[in-house]
Amino acid sequence: MAAAAPVAADDDERRRRPGAALEDSRSQEGANGEAESGELSRLRAELAGALAEMETMKAVAEVSESTKAEAVAAVQRQCQEEVASLQAILKDSISSYEAQITALKQERQQQQQDCEEKERELGRLKQLLSRAYPLDSLEKQMEKAHEDSEKLREIVLPMEKEIEELKAKLLRAEELIQEIQRRPRHAPSLHGSTELLPLSRDPSPPLEPLEELSGDGGPAAEAFAHNCDDSASISSFSLGGGVGSSSSLPQSRQGLSPEQEETASLVSTGTLVPEGIYLPPPGYQLVPDTQWEQLQTEGRQLQKDLESVSRERDELQEGLRRSNEDCAKQMQVLLAQVQNSEQLLRTLQGTVSQAQERVQLQMAELVTTHKCLHHEVKRLNEENQGLRAEQLPSSAPQGSQQEQGEEESLPSSVPELQQLLCCTRQEARARLQAQEHGAERLRIEIVTLREALEEETVARASLEGQLRVQREETEVLEASLCSLRTEMERVQQEQSKAQLPDLLSEQRAKVLRLQAELETSEQVQRDFVRLSQALQVRLERIRQAETLEQVRSIMDEAPLTDVRDIKDT
């Protein structure tokens, strides 16, 4: 029984083990499924984040493209406006230059016309003088012609003598050349300086026939050495021949002039050392000393002329610099004067406007006072006429009443009559005095009113004169201001013309800068496009991935922090 119990326990354990293994495998599968679902949800969240990031990047790219397009359009508009303004400035400058050229042409034509008129006037005056004094002019012309002929004769005679002498020398030289050509080939060469040969001092013999003769020199001309003294002047020529020319020289000297004999002797002495004769290298030419000295003097003269021209150029440059400085100073002075004149004109305009307002107020007051005085005079005249008209009818009834009263109350005695007479006389005198006082008062009032009216008219005339003077002054100041403004505009135009190259260079620099900015913006746009393409490619790879490992490997790739990291696909 004891042995059967352990066996049963082992069987139970064996039965329990497969169930536990199944439960463990199920729990592991559940854990794996949960992990895979969590990983899948995480990947889905990352995919959603990547999609959202891609959408935001697309939106940013679209916004940047729109802003870039707007900026490029604004830059292009600004460039077009600047180019149009430059073209307008250039057109204005060209039109101003053309106007100046036409004005200068007109001035030149006017000057030519003035010169022609002056010449015609001078010719007319000469004709008038010749008509007025014909004998004197003819005598003067004859004397002048005689003096001119004498001067020409004095100039021509020495020239003719020189020509004759030169012809004689030329004939002697040609005869000598012919004699030398007729000799047999015995004279090898002719060598001498300007101090020995008279032919070297004669400018008449040309070098061309000498060079032709030197071409027939034979082997002796080829054997000449170049070790002679450079300071010796070569003015002769070389002929072909041998060493035995000394025996034939006495025969050739027969029938020659003394100068030719001297030349022949010099030839005989010069032929002794043929190695000392200097032949110029090809491309060079031997010239006489006189011609060499003449060339040196011409060179010195040209050097002096060049120095004088350089000095004149320096002086002109200095004068131009001074004139530019003076022009700048004058410009500053003109600008200061223009500013002062504008300020003075503003002050004068203010004073003139104030004076005009005061004059207008005074004129209005004078007009009102004139009207009041006119009405007062009219009223006083009417009152005077009314008083005069009232006195006549009032005197008539008073007289009738007095007559009636007198008739009623006539005095009965002489003293009463005398007393009545005195009373009537006093009353009449008082009435006359009152009338005279009233008339005098009216006359005084009329005179005072007339004087006031005259004073007002004089004041009005003086004010009108002051106003006229001030208007003339303002017109003069406005004209001077207009002239100063035109001068200032001309100076500003000159300054703007001088500043046009600088402005053009600035505009070119600005255009280059804008082009660089445009290129950078285009590069940024291309970088955005490449980045969006790379993101789209990565998203497409994620979509085409078959397993989670491929998706994880794609997501674990290096993040796109720089556009240079994007591989071109």
UniProtKB/Swiss-Prot annotation:
Keywords: Acetylation, Cell projection, Cilium biogenesis/degradation, Coiled coil, Cytoplasm, Cytoskeleton, Endocytosis, Endosome, Phosphoprotein, Protein transport, Transport. It is found in: Cytoplasm; Early endosome; Cytoplasm, Cytoskeleton, Microtubule organizing center, Centrosome; Cytoplasm, Cytoskeleton, Cilium basal body. GO terms for biological process: cell projection organization; endocytosis; protein transport; regulation of cilium assembly. InterPro entries: Rabaptin (IPR003914), Rabaptin_coiled-coil (IPR018514), Rabaptin_Rab5-bd_dom (IPR015390). Its main location: cytoplasm. Residues 1-41, 180-265, 388-411 are annotated as: Disordered. The modification Phosphoserine is found at S189, S193, S200, S204. The modification N-acetylalanine is found at A2. It comes from the Eukaryota. One of its GO terms (molecular function) is growth factor activity. Belongs to the rabaptin family. Plays a role in membrane trafficking and in homotypic early endosome fusion. Participates in arteriogenesis by regulating vascular endothelial growth factor receptor 2/VEGFR2 cell surface expression and endosomal trafficking. By interacting with SDCCAG8, localizes to centrosomes and plays a critical role in ciliogenesis. Heterodimer with RABGEF1. The dimer binds RAB5A that has been activated by GTP-binding. Interacts with SDCCAG8; this interaction is important for ciliogenesis regulation. Interacts with RAB4A; this interaction may mediate VEGFR2 cell surface expression. This is Rab GTPase-binding effector protein 2. It comes from Homo sapiens.
